[in-house]
């Protein structure tokens, strides 16, 4: 079951109802509103008409870092160093590549807003490069001890998976305790993602937000 939350320009009510927001009337999603939504376990997605909806899935998909499944072939790819992994060097390109598919929930309004959050140090990208070209990547929102994965793309074998492994290693090293993947898909399930009830997710989110994790040493 997925709950849809109504959200006005300045508030996020707790009553679950549907909201459709015409793109022409919402050229920019308030970044502060967006962060407040994430802190309540709510996130936005656009439909094919450009309207933004707010989601709070129940159950919620998460990745327990110790449960990440790394296949032998993926381990071999990582060991061979086929891809160069970078962080935060091409955020907007990663997001645009994630959006470049037949059906996408990422529109220009979201790209503009997440760009602002990236410059504020709250959104991050992990990238796989080969021969100077970006061939895979992912991005998400980092809030205290929680990381909310948003999307990933791959244009070469295992490129996005290599990014995920690098992300998990980074999050563990920095002390993050909650890795939210929002929805469960067969692809994510194969990597070790599972579901928990929303009430449990909210408890874990509150606990994660009590921490003071930073993305890198320079943020401390």
Kindly label every feature range from the protein language model.
Residues 4-220:
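N-acyltransferase acceptor-side catalytic subdomain
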